[in-house]
Every structure is written in structure tokens, then in C-alpha cells.
Amino acid sequence: MIKVHWFRDTPEERNDWLRFGLMELSKKKEINYAEWDLKKMTNYGFSNKILSYGSLRHLSFLVVEDGERKIKCIIDNEDSFAFLSELIVHADVYFCAGYNSNVFQQKSLPKFYIWQNQEDVAWYTDLLSKKIPDFENQFYKVKRFIPIGPNLWKHLPISKTRQLCLNIEHRLRKSLGLSNQYRIVHEVFRSRYKDLLKLRNQQLSFDITLSDTSWGWPNHRIKLHQQLKKLSQKGFKINSELKLTEPSVCDNSISLNLNPENFSMKIGEIKNYEQMLASSKIGVFTCGFHWGWRNIFTLALFIGIPVITDRLLTEPYFDINNFKIWETEDEDWRLLQNCLQEITIIDWNNIKSENQKAFDKYLAPEVVARYVVNESLK
């Protein structure tokens, strides 16, 4: 049986979707899955240089073995292709959530948005101009992955007696050199997944629900929220908020001098974001910071509602055209009103059904886990 070892370093929430999938495959006896403390990675072939590297943020380290080979895998769930980790040299396979074919196949800069000027992307251009020549000989290891999955955490109460038993079991397993137990985490993930499935049954109540921040080319986001205000004034049911965040050198927002008194930009009220999003005719999302997907975007795909987004620069391992979404580069977001007027309740339900089928085919946790296992062993 194929064995998968995950060497844990907290926090790794961005890769919980894969983690849940591996737990499910193990429960079905498709694989043997184990979790270990990070320092155990050297017993399975990883370099001890990783342990002294510093920040391992958004990186996970796995070994997949089939009885003959031990394949060292890094799962990179950073927002962008620009943040390829130099630790790739210590991996056999490198799964990259921020995959972009221009970067990793053509070894060139990505095709930026038409509304982005040279100053908007200068920081990334400079970074990539160094990383591509430095690591292009490692690009053969890079494989497409998925962006951040929906949040899988929730609070599940545990009795004092059970917690005591778990603590004893944990100490015993440590003393015997056994892998870490993850039973409680698996229960949390399963419970949360059931909650997510219920969101698919929400009825249409709103036109657009969007909770947003200025992080990531704020002028573009401001234009979106200005358009949402116009739509609200025309009678569309809009609930949205744009909060101001600290400016960044990455997207040149540090030079904009945005007035805090103009924020937050708010329309209506958002009480339960996930439920209201699931009840909205359209999910609309600007590109994430560093062009990455946000987990709320992936949640919208899971729920199945129609989605309008900036053209996607990050490429998952499946064809995004399997989903009914609209990609745009219109900085004035004029597409919104057209879609709101054209999509009927029948269309909405049909699109949801098709998108849910696509999600379950390409993005269900077990499917993602099988993809990682199979691609690792190719």
C-alpha cells in the first residue's frame, strides 16, 4: 500500500484541504497516511537544512512512498508564482498553488492585466527577473496544484475525560516513536465539510455579497466598490464592504496616500458572510494579493454560484472552464449589471448544479489527495 507521510509545522491551514483528503483516503484504505513532527523529515530523506531555514510559511513537506521509492514533495500554497521557495532544491516534486505557465514553462514574465502599469508590477518584475534565472533548472519539478481551499476549521467541544485520554495517548505515542494522532482534527474537518455542503442548499436572496479589503491594487478594488454602489442605487440587492489595510510596496499602494476617512466603503450589512454569499446571484472577486485566489473564491466555486473575477493568472491542475465563471479585465466592472439582469432563477440553479458537479469532480478533498499521490509517483 502507498504510504504518505506529512511532516507538520504549524500553521499550515492553507493546505488543510489536501490534508483532509489524505485522511479520507486513509480511512477508505486507499493509502496509509501518517503525520509526524517536522524534525522527523530527515529520517525520510529531507535535508536537515530545511529545519534551520527560518520561516516555512505556507509550505508543507510530504513523502510519498510506494515500496520502492520515497518521493520528497513540497506543497507550496503561497499566493503567487513570485514566491517560489528556494527550498525547491530539496524536493523531488514541487506542487505550486501559484502556478503560471508563462513563468514555469516559458520562463518569462506572466501576462499582467491591461490596467496594471509598470509601477504596479515593478516589485514583482524585479523579483521574478532574479528568481527565474536562479531556479529555472528546478522548474521541471514544479506541478500545478490548487489555490487555498475553503476554511475547514470550526470549534468542536471535547469533554475533559476525552481530552485527558488524548493527552495520555499523545505522550505514549511520542515515547514509542509513533506518528502523531490526528483523529480529532479529522472529526473537525468532517463536521465542517458537512456545514459547507449545507451552503449549497441556500435559496437566492441577494444579488451580490462581498467582504473585501484594499490589499492588492486598491484603486482597482475601489472601482469595483464604486460600481457596487451604483448598482445598489439602481435597486440591486448589494451587501458589501471594503476595508482599508496597510499599504504595501508589493503593489505600489504605498505611493497612493489613500485617505482613511474614506473607508470603510460599505453598502448594506453582512451578518454571515458564507451564508449570504451562498444566497447571492453572483460572487464577484478582484484578483487576490499577489494575484492569488482567496479561499472565499474557492468557496464560491464549491457552493456553485456564478462567479465574475479578474482574469486568473494562477492555473490549477484542471481546466477552469469546467466551471461557469466570467473572467474580465474591465477595470470598471460593467459586466456585473449585464449578468445580474440576464441570470434568471432557473439559470442560477442550473449553473449551481453544474458548478457543484465540476467541483466534486476536480476539487473534492479526496480528488485533490489522489492527484498529489499519483503525480508524485509518476
Where are these regions (language model features)?
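Short, Lys/Arg-enriched, disordered terminal segments
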Residues: 1, 377-378
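Nucleotide-sugar donor-binding catalytic core of glycosyltransferases
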Residues: 2-63, 67-291, 310-320, 365
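Catalytic binding pocket for nucleotide-activated donors in carbohydrate/polymer assembly enzymes
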Residues: 259-262, 270-377
